[in-house]
Amino acid sequence: MITVTFFWVGIVLGAIWTFYRVVLYPYRVSPLRTLPQSQRGHWLWNHAFSEFLQPIGQLHAELLLQIPNDGMICLRGLFGAPKILLTSPKSLADVLVHRADDFEKLPGERKILRAVVGDGLVTAEGDVHYQQKRKLLASFTPPKIRALYPVFWKEATALTQQIRRTLTHDGSGIYTGTTDMVYWAPRVSMDMIGAAGFGQSFHSVRDVDSEIIHCYEKAFAIGAGHLLCVFADTLLPRIILQWLPWPRWRQFRQNIDSIQDFCHQWVTDAKATSALGDGIPSNLLANMIHTGEYTFQELIEQVRTFLAAGHENTSSVVMWVMLALASDSELQSRLRQELQASLPEVELDKVDLAILEQLPLLNAVVSETIRLFPPLPIGNRIAIRDTTVMNHPIPKGTPFLIVPRAINRSSELWGPDADRFNADRWINPDTGRFNNHGGASSNYSFLSFFHGPHNCIGQNFARAELRTVVAAVIRSFDMVLDNPAADVSPVGWFTPRPADGVKVKLRSLV
């Protein structure tokens, strides 16, 4: 009888606790209850899965403009659980910079990233992150990046030469044809990070059967089935997955293991070269080894991280910048004139390619592409202690959404043409020089590389890659879209790309 009584007491207490946590606390007690709330969620799970809706970040961009707010909007997940959408430079500055130590990536997100891109800088937090970034900064100084321009240019010109080989010669020295830049973008990005990052010659551009490219295409495939593989690989014990009749997961795991093996071999090669003491370090990995501050396994993890970040992110932006230029013949012509004036065909080998950093329109095109199409369209943080944002109390465990796609396209921050590709916003009309703000009033209006301690350490490396690819392609070809009516909506969860690809008609120029 006593056992039965305790059972029912437990049931009643559990029901009371559930009612308090699900109904009373979120809407009557929590300090977050006074924030503007979204009413657009699903009737059952509210906004619990809003981060996965395609295009990524589009819903949040709409909420940002539709719901009056002072910098934060409270979205609700399962059972009324809060999720705070940051919407203003002030709230972003608090989370990313002023109180950065109070926030970390979600544990689940870090676990997924660790499985896919390695246990490097991207997944590190706290003092571990500080120490890793401190050691890595020496490899990403402006002089070190400028020294890599000849490497980038070599790979970019290899791209244009290989594209030319796929075109048809008309007998008068002109090559014409159609190609899809979605095919070429990951290959040239892989070759660039291979050469400049690790001292490796992948030849992905000319090798149709490039093993490293195939591994990455399969490991980072687009689709819900692939995303399920990533979650399962992260959340379920390997011994259970190995017994399941799931060929797709096995292929995913095999590709991730192959990438790990590649990284192991590259580090082995680089350390052997370093031991010979032959010359000044000429790539990122060689610079890291030269410091003597890394163990062998730490080098492997950082290489995995930089391979994923340096390849996938750059590849995505290359696709979008080619789409933008192929869609605007006038902009393309202006850019070509600027490039031809600064990079004459005669004695090009004697030109300091770092001059690309000084070209206003080239840098404007690159910045505008990164603004409109950030490689990472959404990110998460969680409060690891009780804190405040814009003087508003935030309980420990509160998750936050940081959505570069929404912030970068906010008409309140970028003006009425925020959704339109307008490279000229990055050029001062009075001087004709490049500016680094695009007309926005705050640097937090541009979130593509985030800000603060966790900003992207490789952003200048990525910009240098993009400058050289754009310069090489636009100097070599005239481009127009093969099908202007094609669907160019962003698809994919990690690094979105145009849904129907970037099919362009090319005509050789040099």
From Swiss-Prot:
Any one GO molecular function term: iron ion binding
Cofactor(s) the record lists: heme
One Pfam family it belongs to: p450
Membrane topology: Single-pass membrane protein
GO cellular component: membrane
InterPro entries found in the cross-reference section: Cyt_P450 (IPR001128), Cyt_P450_E_grp-IV (IPR002403), Cyt_P450_sf (IPR036396), Cytochrome_P450_monoxygenase (IPR050121)
Function: Cytochrome P450 monooxygenase; part of the gene cluster that mediates the biosynthesis of the indole diterpenes penitrems. The geranylgeranyl diphosphate (GGPP) synthase penG catalyzes the first step in penitrem biosynthesis via conversion of farnesyl pyrophosphate and isopentyl pyrophosphate into geranylgeranyl pyrophosphate (GGPP). Condensation of indole-3-glycerol phosphate with GGPP by the prenyl transferase penC then forms 3-geranylgeranylindole (3-GGI).
PANTHER family given in the database record: CYTOCHROME P450 (PTHR24305), CYTOCHROME P450 12A4, MITOCHONDRIAL-RELATED (PTHR24305:SF166)
Name by which UniProt lists this protein: Cytochrome P450 monooxygenase PC-21
Protein species of origin: Penicillium crustosum (Blue mold fungus)
